[in-house]
């Protein structure tokens, strides 16, 4: 059991490394783009698919390893079931909270974009005409 736990920990660390590397590479190689617009160049980015495939494979390996853990029989099954139900409820709450935060952040992005547009217009109008 300890070997499986170590293996699981190693796989999770590997997945975290993949995600960190993906973010770093994509951040370093992503071309500049306008607010609110997605360019064709970004949609055609080949690294996205490569990193997504690596992360998906790591997630599948973790899932397979977790499924291989033995389930203890007896009264603990009911406890595990109860804990899973509670965790599902907590997860739903967190998802709802996250959805709210995403909505708030999208609203704030809109405000920032409007302010940037105002700043740009002000700067353009304050320049002397040639």
From Swiss-Prot:
<dbReference type="GO" id="GO:0006357">
    <property type="term" value="P:regulation of transcription by RNA polymerase II"/>
</dbReference>
<keyword id="KW-0804">Transcription</keyword>
<comment type="similarity">
    <text>Belongs to the Mediator complex subunit 21 family.</text>
</comment>
<keyword id="KW-0175">Coiled coil</keyword>
<dbReference type="GO" id="GO:0003712">
    <property type="term" value="F:transcription coregulator activity"/>
</dbReference>
<protein>
    <recommendedName>
        <fullName>Mediator of RNA polymerase II transcription subunit 21</fullName>
    </recommendedName>
</protein>
<dbReference type="GO" id="GO:0016592">
    <property type="term" value="C:mediator complex"/>
</dbReference>
<comment type="subunit">
    <text>Component of the Mediator complex. Interacts with let49/mdt-7.</text>
</comment>
<feature type="coiled-coil region">
    <location>
        <begin position="71"/>
        <end position="99"/>
    </location>
</feature>
<keyword id="KW-0539">Nucleus</keyword>
<keyword id="KW-0010">Activator</keyword>
<dbReference type="InterPro" id="IPR037212">
    <property type="entry name" value="Med7/Med21-like"/>
</dbReference>
<keyword id="KW-0805">Transcription regulation</keyword>
<comment type="function">
    <text>Component of the Mediator complex, a coactivator involved in the regulated transcription of nearly all RNA polymerase II-dependent genes. Mediator functions as a bridge to convey information from gene-specific regulatory proteins to the basal RNA polymerase II transcription machinery. Mediator is recruited to promoters by direct interactions with regulatory proteins and serves as a scaffold for the assembly of a functional preinitiation complex with RNA polymerase II and the general transcription factors.</text>
</comment>
<dbReference type="InterPro" id="IPR021384">
    <property type="entry name" value="Mediator_Med21"/>
</dbReference>
């Amino acid at each position: 059991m300890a070997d499986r736990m170590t293996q699981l920990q190693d796989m999770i660390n590997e997945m975290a490394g993949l995600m960190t590397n993906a973010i770093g590479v994509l951040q370093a190689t992503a071309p500049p783009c306008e607010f609110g617009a997605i360019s064709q160049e970004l949609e055609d980015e080949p690294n996205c698919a490569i990193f997504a495939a690596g992360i998906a494979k790591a997630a599948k390996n973790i899932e397979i390893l977790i499924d291989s853990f033995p389930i203890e029989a007896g009264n603990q099954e009911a406890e595990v079931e109860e804990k899973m139900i509670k965790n599902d409820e907590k997860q739903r709450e967190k998802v709802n909270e996250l959805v709210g935060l995403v909505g708030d952040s999208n609203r704030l992005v809109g405000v920032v974009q409007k302010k940037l547009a105002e700043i740009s217009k002000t700067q353009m109008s304050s320049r002397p005409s040639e």
